Amino acid sequence: DFKLKEVAYSVILLVMMVPMQVTSAGFVSFMSDLKLTNTYWPLIIPSIAAPAVVYFMRSYMKSSFPLDIVEAARIDGCGEFRTFLSIAIPMMKPAIAVQAIFAFIASWNNFYTPNMILISVDLKKKTLPMMVSALQSSDKFNDYGAIYLAIALSIIPIIIAYVLLSRFIIAGVALGGVKE
């Protein structure tokens, strides 16, 4: 707990309301200053601490994380860091899994930000939506069967991510169903 907790949360909610297109010029300039253009880091890191993730995780903790467990851990002599790693993180796995799936899908389908950050003409530094767009807009390549096959194959990583992370969601639902 800290004094301006609610103010900080309100600022995070206000940031959620600002469209990405409004801040994109500043974001690209900042990434250029950090020499991170033409890398994938500006596409990965912002989704970890996105305002929607903070909002969802806070809501999940307030509704599903009993503070009695933290107090019991403190009484047992467990430090804050160990309480976080041993108790909070395992209880938060369903929410972390949901946010990981949402962040992965949003990043995977994002066209706008990679189109500004990955500015080299090298085709090795493109995301899948950029490649599909290049295929669809090409005058020389009009094999629509291959284009639609590429689009269909682009779903496979999303399915793999869901299959790998869904067990945490199911375990969380089962854990939440057991009440005293």
Positions of PLM-derived features:
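A structural signal for multi-pass alpha-helical bundles of membrane permease subunits
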Residues: D1-E180
